[in-house]
Amino acid sequence: GIRDCLLSRGLGDVYKRQLQGRGVLVSNEYVAARAEILKSNLERMGVSNAVVLNETPARIAEALPEFFDRVLVDAPCSGEGMFRKEPVAQQQHCEALVKQCAELGAQILDCAAAALAPGGQLVYSTCTFAPEEDEGQVAAFLQRHPEFALADVLGNVDYTFGSAGEENRTGGLSLDVSKVRRIWPCQGGEGHFMARLVKAGTPRTLPPEGEYTPEEQLWLAAAAQAGKKSKGKAAKPAKTADARSTRRADSRACRDAVQGTSRRTRDTGAGEATPAQSLAAWQEFARQYFPALAQRPAVVHGGGVLLSVAFPQTGLHVLRAGVFVGSVQKGRFVPEHHLFTAFGSLCTNCCLLYTSDAAD
């Protein structure tokens, strides 16, 4: 799994390509409003194996000790690299802010270290020039955590970017600054800093694609059991319709889902069907339009159906775990935008969706 303290669109797309549908990408944002934006970004990118949390780093570390194989800490910082783009950042800047951000970054790094599995890798990044948050931060972390070693950010790649760190910015602590990187504004960046740290131990390996470890199978079963206990309204009986009108309705619903223009209640609202009815409706829809997904583990959450990911039930505040594929409305299954961004290439019988309605 990968835990990301703050995920931007670009970072999410990179991890989506690297994971290739395997493992789980856990993305956390402490601010509730930004967490909702994060969830929407992952949906638009079609990430199918993501979990979005709205939690504190300390609670994550406590609930998931040594759980993650990769951790990216895009730390909250004083934002000195944003002075050129955001004048308000310069107006708000002060020494107290730098100190506060350095202390907060240290706390987050300690939590990330506890959540990282043996042999895992931790990447720390900021967009500030302040040495207390950059070279000094990494040097102090290594003193607190001797189980970590500094690795070259560039690794084995055949290209370079930015420049090495600076020895006079370590606060008098020992650090091989040649292994960290800065990207100054004159180098096409915005004052970015990054370092890569490796935890002692043997790295774990992911199971083959489409397979789950025994532990992951237990997590999926627990999620399914929790979904069966969720409350939902009784399903309204569907009106009798011929095959043509049914396909026309499917076409319109799928068109709205593909375009992301649906005004329907999201997965945070109550559904119209019981969990069992919702799952049955999804499976019927999937057999016709997404047969490759019909047997994927699915759960019901907030009245909607999600293709779940293998993630333990920890009591953490989870905004999204998996792909929200749709919900039952007015007695029929209505697909969601996320279904098409994540699995649109798997859709079959498309001619039934796009040719059944002359208006399409």
For the regions a language model picked out, list residue spans one by one.
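Mobile active-site "lid"/loop adjacent to the S-adenosyl-L-methionine
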Residues: 32-33, 70-110, 123, 128-135
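Conserved SAM-binding motif I beta-strand of class I
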Residues: 24-29
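S-adenosyl-L-methionine
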Residues: 36-63
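A short acidic, Gly/Pro-enriched loop at the edge of an enzyme's catalytic core
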Residues: 62-70
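Helix-to-beta-strand junctions that scaffold the AdoMet/dcAdoMet cofactor pocket
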Residues: 20, 116-117
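Single conserved hydrophobic/aromatic residue that forms the stacking wall/gate
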Residues: 1-11, 15, 354-358
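Polybasic, low-complexity RNA-engagement segments
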Residues: 190, 200-356, 360
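Conserved Class I S-adenosyl-L-methionine
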Residues: 135-156
